[in-house]
Amino acid sequence: GEPSHPHVPWSKTVIYELHVKGFTANAPWLPPELRGTYAGLAHPATLSYLQDLGVTSIELLPIQAKQSELFLQERNRTNYWGYSTLGYFAPEASYATKQAQEAGAGAVRQEVIDMVRAMHEAGFEVIMDVVYNHTCESGPEGPTICWRGLDNLAYYRRTKDKVSRLYDTTGCGNSLDFTNTHVTTFAVDSLRYWAKRIGIDGFRFDLAATLARLDGEFT
């Protein structure tokens, strides 16, 4: 059966924030093939290390599928931290083991599910950083990958004086328009997916205030 989700009283919660790849990339207790991976984070030795620290909850920096910004790609660099989301319903494949990557998306997803299950069995709550304030499509000079091609005017906020001008409250080139119910539904559906299908216990919203900012005010 599925392990029960730990429920730590807020007064006793100790959150440890980590990057799946960065935290395990040089872990001496892991075999090389597990370093930098979801499976490496789920390894008993990794979980034992975290237990020894006395933390109760693990906050994962973004693990939703990402794509680096164009200006980074042009310099042969990547957005290491993952705050450039491409797939809100998909885990980032580059953090999976080589075996899972070669097996395909289903195997990558299963590796994430197994990681969360192992954390629960070890007594940890699992929190995930999520980025709904902007997408990887960046500003006007950015690529058309998904939302811009589907319905540019509906998904992204615009300035009042010029509908063609993106209203950038994030400093990342665009801002998703949460005054549009379709955008809100999309975000909630993806959160529900991660909670119900993957097993995530909670979420930390990047630049949360921008999600409800309207005409310069938080509503």
Predicted features by range, described:
Residues 1-17, 24-37:
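The feature marks proteins involved in alpha-glucan
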Residues 21-44, 48-199, 207-218:
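Substrate-binding/active-site clefts of carbohydrate-active enzymes
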